[in-house]
Amino acid sequence: MKLLEKMTYVECFMIIMATWFMFISYSHGANVAAAPGTNGLDTAWYDARAAYYGDIHGGGTELEGACGYGDLNKHGYGLATAALSTALFNSGASCGACYEIMCSPNPQGCLSGSIKITATDLCPPGSAWCYLPNKHFDLSLPMFIKIAQVKAKMVPVRYRRVPCAKTGGVKFEVKGNPNILTILPYNVGGAGDIIAVSAKGSKTAWVVMSRYWGQNWTTNVNLTGQSVSLRVTTSDGITKDFTDVMPASWGFGQTFDGKTNF
């Protein structure tokens, strides 16, 4: 009582409002979008649909794909991948992003549990469910049957962004020719999807690279014969420098290990 007597009306009002807000937030938690976590990702759940492609052995994952990763097994992505509809693919900007997906409760054919996948391709535009504004995931069959019965063929799902857990450092595959240097970063942890790449030769200043297609980044600055450092920024705003990741003797077709990750 003595404590209350010393409090002003304003202080009492602020405490009451704070308590009311906490009550509303917790009691309606299922309807409140989750705020971005410390990793800067939007962790709210959204609705979409999912189907599958290929066979039980993962057929189809060895194809190039719209992100440019090529053979997904060779590049370490394996079967835990998905082709995204146009709305989610975002012209290739979502390549490398990781998602947690679970079948929506109750629909026939759904199984409990969830899966985590990396975005590596664009869902075929010829499929009606891949057109704008539909949100859709084409999963490899081995991943689909972890959340739904194969006979369901297509199911409603819920999805959210999650940090990518990758083993080892970021890898950089060198493509192109002396006139156009193209870099494919892969095995990217953290947010996974990249929004900017810059390159610096041992004799040049930093050069901003352009997204060529998918996750391929390019510049027409000739860096042949120079050791090359690469600067990568992921969608959560984190930037990491990979100093002299490419030695002066680098060549086209080679892949270099950044040693560290996000």
UniProtKB/Swiss-Prot annotation:
Signal peptide coordinates: 1-29
GO cellular component term of the entry, any: extracellular region
Keyword tags: Cell wall, Cell wall biogenesis/degradation, Membrane, Secreted, Signal
SUPFAM superfamilies: Barwin-like endoglucanases, PHL pollen allergen
Location relative to the cell: Secreted, Cell wall; Membrane
GO biological-process terms attached to the record: anatomical structure morphogenesis; plant-type cell wall loosening
Domain Expansin-like EG45: 64-169
SMART domains noted in UniProt: DPBB_1
Membrane topology, record value: Peripheral membrane protein
Name of one Pfam family that matches: Expansin_C
Expansin-like CBD domain: residues covered: 179-258
Main location: secreted
Top-level taxon of the source organism: Eukaryota
Keyword hit for Cytoplasm: no
Role played: Causes loosening and extension of plant cell walls by disrupting non-covalent bonding between cellulose microfibrils and matrix glucans. No enzymatic activity has been found.
Family of this protein: Belongs to the expansin family. Expansin A subfamily.
Record protein name field: Expansin-A21
Encoding gene per record: EXPA21
